[in-house]
Amino acid sequence: RRAWEADALVYMTSGSIDVAISKLDKDSPDYYKQMQRCIEDHSIESSICKNVGSEALAYCVDEGVQIFGGAGFIEDYPIAQMYRDERINRIFEGTNEINKLIISGYALKKAILDEIPIREMILLRSDFGINDSSNSIQDLIEESQAVEMSRTIVLNVLNDLIVAYGQDFKNDQFLVENFAEMITAFSIMDTGIKKIKNITNHDQKRFTLPVLKLSILVNYQEVLSKSKDICDYIENHNDSISTLSKIDDCSKLVSFSESKIC
């Protein structure tokens, strides 16, 4: 599952960057500045890719060491080098904690500059987005609803954070980390749904569906959990009315269990 999620995110992000750059005029005198701007516009997605990818590798290699047992720490076996090399991935190219600062910081910046019109989007999603059929796929109706509900929750939580803290939000480590993990979980779900839409091979889709269902199950629960933590924190530190009631409504409207995966 983790490897599939990382693969989906990286292909989506790199493809989006390629499309954006392909639309630029190569004869323009500021072509490279425009290219840099295109890449910077994908800062959130790139940071998510780095975090998800490095943590997926960390999990897989750690399981590999467990399989090798004590031999996993002996240099004669390849897993020992993998374990050592993997650990640095979460440190260089921006530690994963710094990437979480980037994710939350850029989301805040885009919302304040109205690049993400969150208030208008919230008003349009009074039904939590469950009636939005644009992402719905046969056999994945409930999963599609979970993605749209998660989108609504992320928008509401970001709005609450801005109302309660303004730009000071980025200075609170608890809020920054939890909100970044919320965005990451939602991005995995949203990208997964889009990826499976593009699979035309019947057998490939049949084998991929359980992976996607498990991915959405895990990440939907992550969105609900992190959003509740953030809203509880806001209520304890600020008089702002949070979106806790909406989160509770969402969790009642769509409930997952492992039995629904297969």
Regions found by a protein language model. Give the residues of each.
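Flavin-dependent oxidoreductase catalytic core characteristic
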Residues: 1-262
